[in-house]
Amino acid sequence: MAFANFRRILRLPNFEKKRLREYEHVRRDVDPNQVWEIIGELGDGAFGKVYKAKNRETGILAAAKVIETKNEEELEDYMVEIEILATCNHHFIVKLLGAFYWEGKLWIMIEFCPGGAVDAVMLELDRGLKEPEIKTICRQMLEALAYLHSMKIIHRDLKAGNVLLTLDGDIKLADFGVSAKNVKTLQRRDSFIGTPYWMAPEVVMCETMKDAPYDYKADIWSLGITLIEMAQIEPPHHELNPMRVLLKIAKSEPPTLSSLSKWSPEFHSFLKTALDKNPETRPSAAQLLEHPFVKKASGNKPLRDLVAEAKAEVLDEIEEQGEAEEEEDSDMLSPKTKGVSQSTHVEIGKDIEREQVGNGIKPHSATSPQKTDSQADNYSQRRNNEVKNCPENGRPDAVNGKPDIIILNPLSSNLEPKRNSTAESYRGEEHSSASSQRQRSAQSAELVPNGSFDSPTRYFTNWSKRDSDSGSNSASESMDISMNLSADLSMNKETGFLSHRENRLHKKTLKRTRRFVVDGVEVSITTSKIIGDDEKKDEEMRFLRRQELRELRLLQKEEHRHQAQLTSKHSFQLEQMSRRFEQEMNSKRKFYDTELETLERHQKQQIVWMEQEHAFRRRDEAKHIKTEQERDHIKFLEQLKLRKKELKAHVEKLPRQQRRETMKVQMDGFAHKKQTEEQQFVNRQKEDLNLAMRVIVLENRKEIYNKEREFLNKKQQLLRDRESVIWELEERHLQERHQLVKQQLKDQYFLQRHELLRKHEKEQEQMQRYNQRMMEQLRLRQQQEKVRLPKNQKAEAKTRMTMFKKSLHISPSGSAAEQRDKIKQFSLQEEKRQKAERLQQQQKHEHQLMEMLAECDCNVRDLLQMQNEKCHLLVEHETQKLKSLDEHHIQLIREWRENIRPRKKAFEDELELKKEAQEMFFRLNEEVAGDPFLSNKPTRFYSFSSPEAS
């Protein structure tokens, strides 16, 4: 079910499937075999094999990294590395010589560095680097990092295995497979990727917390760890499991050099400055270049000498210690030496002689180490401790011996050394051979570089000894001698005498002679060291740790790809939601804009129609009134005529003498009165007409005003509806976005849990293999002890019997029969002692087995506890993030609602202003319409929303 959910989370829409892309720096139309010739295999990395290739035209050498890809998505995973290599042009960074994609394989051609990787050189020389060498490498690495960081690139996998050396004494930073190319210089990343031992604390925290991303300062921490690795061969906490070291990095103090007096104060100061757990106060690469430790470093002569020493011709000789020689040496030891040896102490030294000659090399003889005894367990423990700590006096430890090396013939000076660079140089995963032509036994698991040392001082191997053949010079009774011998052997047994004697027979002495040229002078260095069975175990542990790192890197790569896919899906979902929100918003706006346009168009048509109707109405009404007034005017004139007739008739009734004069007076008065009355009548008709027209105009204007107000109300209601819908959309969008982001956060943590469970399964698998390996080693060792015990007991019984008989011969007492009884009694005691010894060995083996089982169970419990803590921390962090997200959403909704109130008020105020403006507009028109001087002017009405009205 969980896997189905995981597939559902990473599933992208069908139309988002990418077509075949054409990459700028990758050629798809050329077979790389036609351009490059494969001349050898360099190694096998985590994602593919690395070959040594030669350009068929120019003859340039390259390291060809060949990676099989199943699909285009996997091909895209390597594009960042190719792009970084193609864009970077720096003296201390490897260059990209070409990239091809042919028949499902990606070929990345990288600049070839004959000196190999720094960690391979340290294994070759069996020592850490000297401070001048570290100083030179550090300065060049800082210059390369300063350039990378200026190009907005975070390397994210700095370690000695990714620092290559050239024959000119320069370094080349390599392996950008997990690097990040940012858009901004201060851009942060939250990917949990890199190699655990070199990870910065802020990168480790990203395994369970993505809200504390890191920046380019993570490379500075990795640089400091790399310097410690160069000084001590191994990085800090190398004895821990790769997954368990993460907890150590996060919780412990920054690591330091194990030896204080061996290194300069400037070196310690530099490491203290670089290994600052707070990335904010951690300096940049440019600032560290001003540190006194690297500021004084000039030139690259130390690295040239280092490469020359690593590429030297090597002669290995093996000297095996025989049993007879051991017994002879054992007889020569004094009882005093025997007594001292009860506290087991192992020191492995080397004899070194260096002689510079003008034209040739003189053979050197190594001083044979003194043959010693020690317990096998203590020896193994001491060897492991020696790998962890370098001596304070700068002398190299004798580590990483090779138990499967056979005696080699001397190399002639005219033979060209056969060297293979390392796959670690390009993937940081494998160490391959960097030695001269050398014969090894067929059982050798892999070629490991041989070692050399820089100091001409002699080293001697002093092993504390304890021998069983002590003898007795006292003339005591036979039974006393028997009891002393039994007690002595019992004490020897308790201190691991028997197993140690057998272990002593398997020790070998390796004498190695290196010949190389320094500044035109040939130098010969001869080293000698004792190797044992633990050498092979150390090599196996190193190989298994590389396997674990490789498995971890594969998991990180897959996790990074899944994270990128999920991030791409989330980005697409957010973008799709934003587009949908915008479309919905635009759709609603468009709908209401269309409604408003329709309403305004209808309003305009309605107003125009009303104005036309009003014009027709005014014209008809004016025509009707004028017709009535003309009729009234005619009636008024007829009345005046009638009155004139009546006046004439009345004057005709007067006497003739008065008639003419009276007629004239009466007619003049009547004419004047008629003119006055007629003028008044016409004026009254005009007033009536104007009044009627004014009433009609006011009625029309009122109708238009009502219609305009009706349309304005409808328009404002539409605007209110639009704003309400927009606000609802905004709130719904906030809710939907919150739900999407919340679901994406859950998907993100689901993916993290899934990847964390995969890591935990891999950790448990590795722990199971480790426990199984420890149990197998214990059973094998116990089986060997069980097989050796009868042989040792037989030899010891023979020796003790001989000693007992000698003691009887030295101090004879009693008759021959009594002596035979004593011998018989001694034999019975020997049988009892051997039986008790076998029983004690069985009990010891059972106890060891129980302890080993308890230790394995404890390891599993500790691992499960740590895994449970990580899971709990991840779940707790998810809960906190979800809670924080909900609180943020609630706060956002609260702020949005608080902002809605002033928006609503401003919107209503704007609508009210439009109403007031409309009322003001019609009020002014009414005042204009009521002006008596303008009453005769034709009136034209406009819509309030029309441009003429405004």
UniProtKB/Swiss-Prot annotation:
Question: EC annotation?
Answer: 2.7.11.1
User: What's the PTM story here?
Assistant: Autophosphorylates. Phosphorylated by plk1/plx1, suggesting the existence of a feedback loop with plk1/plx1. activation of the protein.
Q: Which Pfam families match?
A: Pkinase, PKK
Known catalysed reaction(s)? L-seryl-[protein] + ATP = O-phospho-L-seryl-[protein] + ADP + H(+); L-threonyl-[protein] + ATP = O-phospho-L-threonyl-[protein] + ADP + H(+)
Q: Which residues form the signal peptide?
A: none
How does this chain sit within the bilayer?
Answer: Peripheral membrane protein
Can you tell me which residues bind ATP? 42-50, 65
Q: What is the effect of changing residue 486 to A?
A: Decreased phosphorylation by plk1/plx1
For the Protein kinase domain, which residue ranges apply? 36-294
Q: What is this protein called?
A: Serine/threonine-protein kinase 10-A
